[in-house]
Each structure stands twice: as C-alpha cells, then as structure tokens.
Amino acid sequence: TVRNVCFSKMIKSKADLNYYLEQDRLALGIKPTLKNKLTHDIWHFQIALRKLEYRKNTGKSVFSKIYAVWLQLKVRKLGRKLGFSIPANVFGPGLSIAHAGIIVINKKCKIGANCRIHVCVNIGGGLSKKGNAPMIGNDCYIGPGAKIYGDITLGDNTAIGANAVVNKSFDGNVTLGGIPAKVISDKGPLDILKKPRTEL
C-alpha cells in the first residue's frame, strides 16, 4: 500500500472554479492581465480546461450541456495546437504545464495538486484488461520524456526524472529515475525546490 496520497476534490462550484484558476495562474507564474489571458497559450488552454470541468461536473441545464460541448471543442482545438491530449477532471489545482509539446494523459488518471509537467510525457493505462491508469499524488514533478503506465500509485512529493519509465507503485517523498524507474533519491520536489504547496 502506498502512503502519502491525498487527492483533491474536483471542481464542484463556482468558488472551486475560481480557486483552481487562481492556483493554476500562480503555478504558471503569470500576472493576471487580460493580455496574458488572451496571448499566453498554455494558460488559455488551462482556463478552457477548468471551465469545461466546471460545466461537466455541475451543468444540468440544456444551456450548460451545450456550453460544455462547445468548451470540449475549444479544449480539443487548443490542445491540438499545443500538442496536449489532456482530459477533464484529471489534475488537481496548481497545474503547471512547462512548455508546448506532446503530453498524452489517460482519462482514468488522477493527479493531485501542484503538478509540474514537462513535454513528451505519456501517462497511460498499460496492458491490463481493466485499463486502470496511474494515480499520482500532490506536489509531484514529471520530467521531460517520462512514461508512467499501469494500475499504479505514486505518493505525494514525488519527482520523476527525464525519460524515466515508471511501471510500479512507489511511496512519496522520493525522486525516481531510470528504465525501469527506481528510487534515486529520498528527496522529492518540495525538498529540492522548497516550493510552497497549495492548501487543499
């Protein structure tokens, strides 16, 4: 059993939506200007993704359902432009996508608050019939080229090194690296970066 895993609730209210949007902005290090909202492509994508999550989770009216479809198309269009295939309701608040480039996430994944993710990352379901996907805790760093797959759990405060291939569960507060991945340090990203965490 993997310890130190606590997943954030998904967006269930307008207050949740505003909180997620603000935490994402802070994680990206962006000033809250109209220019940035319109011209910062990654933030633009994340705003659309969070609005889609809100509508999918709360929308019961015909208008909300139609608006959710429009938002889904917008997220898909922006994702194609940036190289992202990121479904709704996967990431907790404080998501920071480092750069435009290929990122593919299975819709069954659950990833906690304060995730920093780089390009050429694939997080998938593996070869099992159930197709269960990884569960990744809070305050995690996913380096460029990392591959994470299967019915596994990674604990809070885990760093995954560049090009690592992770196919089994690990407790938190570690750094993983290699093919297949193994623990290469007993320090996680919070210990290395001293980054303040989002309150859950």
Regions found by a protein language model. Give the residues of each.
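Generic structural "secondary-structure junction" signal
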Residues: 40, 88, 93, 125, ...
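Terminal amphipathic alpha-helical/low-complexity segments used for targeting or macromolecular assembly
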Residues: 1-82, 190-200
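Broad hydrophobic/π-residue packing in well-ordered secondary structure
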Residues: 39, 49-56, 114, 118-119, ...
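Short alpha-helix boundary/capping motifs
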Residues: 79, 107, 119, 143, ...
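Conserved beta-strand-loop-alpha-helix hinge in the C-terminal portion
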Residues: 174, 179-194
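Short linear elements at protein peripheries
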Residues: 65-108, 114
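Left-handed beta-helix
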Residues: 93-94, 98-107, 112-113, 117-119, ...
